[in-house]
């Protein structure tokens, strides 16, 4: 692609003082034939001299990346900090995933590079696909509640999320961006350690932070999280529940009963 063609496609990249396209990676916008203006990153590399017939002309190799999904996630973060964020492609393979809290398990259950449906309750797959199809048809984000499968060390979770379909320049689904805002056990497992982990995740507080604010040792909190201690002393339960802004019975029903 010649510099003149690039100037016509991306007029914002140029000024009277800078007639040549800069090398490297830059952020700009692109107006596709379908939909709204897209935010992109564009890497430009000048190509070697090709011959006498191209004398005086500069050609570039351009690698452009659509940043629409990332920008949507950034915008969502200004409203509220999500528990999880991610991007999956049009085949539902997760290409980006980030968890904003301490892991609920010592085992890695990240869905990265796997189908998102491998982690969701099979009984809800068709319902979820229908909701995604409706959101895509209407070109709108949608709120959705999904349930995950259970693992040996983690009970199934119920998650409330917002999903946004992202289109390519021709109007086809390119990917989906998602933010998870809330989670809880899909069914009561009766495991206080799991309840504690979930409430700590929802309150965005780590083991070390909870230890510092309550005066309870990190070792004790870790044992409570891992289920090695299932019934703490009442004062310990009160301090933790107060810091997490929940009732004692939300985590330890037996301790909460007088």
Each PLM stretch: what is its role?
Residues 1, 100-112, 246:
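PAS/PAS-like sensory domain cap-loop motif
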Residues 2-36, 120-150:
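Terminal output helix/cap of sensory domains in signal transduction proteins
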Residues 42-60, 161-176:
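Short loop/turn elements at sensory-signaling interfaces that couple input to output
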Residues 65-72, 182-186:
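PAS-associated C-terminal cap
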Residues 68-104:
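Sensory modules in modular signal-transduction proteins
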Residues 181-205:
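A short, Lys/Arg-rich alpha-helix, primarily the initiator
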Residues 216-231:
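Recognition helix of helix-turn-helix/homeodomain-like DNA-binding domains
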Residues 235-250:
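DNA major-groove recognition helix of helix-turn-helix/homeodomain DNA-binding modules
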């Amino acid at each position: 692609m010649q510099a003149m063609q690039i100037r016509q496609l991306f007029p914002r990249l140029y000024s009277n003082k800078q007639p040549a396209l800069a090398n490297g990676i830059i952020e700009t916008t692109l107006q596709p034939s379908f939909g709204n203006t897209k935010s992109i990153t564009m890497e430009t590399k000048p190509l070697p001299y090709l011959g006498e017939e191209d004398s005086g002309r500069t050609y570039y190799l351009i690698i452009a990346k659509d940043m629409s999904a990332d920008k949507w996630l950034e915008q969502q973060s200004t409203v509220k900090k999500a528990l999880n964020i991610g991007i999956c492609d049009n085949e539902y393979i997760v290409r980006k995933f980030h968890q904003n809290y301490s892991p609920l398990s010592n085992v890695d259950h990240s869905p990265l590079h796997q189908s998102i449906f491998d982690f969701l309750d099979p009984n809800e797959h068709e319902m979820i696909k229908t909701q995604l199809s409706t959101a895509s048809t209407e070109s709108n984000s949608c709120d959705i509640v999904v349930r995950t499968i259970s693992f040996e060390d983690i009970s199934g979770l119920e998650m409330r999320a917002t999903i946004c379909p992202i289109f390519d320049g021709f109007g086809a689904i390119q990917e989906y961006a998602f933010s998870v805002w809330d989670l809880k056990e899909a069914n009561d497992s009766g495991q206080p350690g799991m309840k504690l982990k979930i409430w700590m995740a929802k309150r965005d507080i780590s083991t070390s932070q909870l230890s510092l604010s309550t005066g309870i040792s990190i070792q004790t909190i870790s044992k409570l999280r891992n289920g090695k201690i299932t019934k703490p002393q009442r004062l310990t339960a009160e301090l933790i529940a107060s810091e997490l802004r929940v009732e004692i019975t939300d985590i330890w029903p037996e301790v909460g009963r007088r």
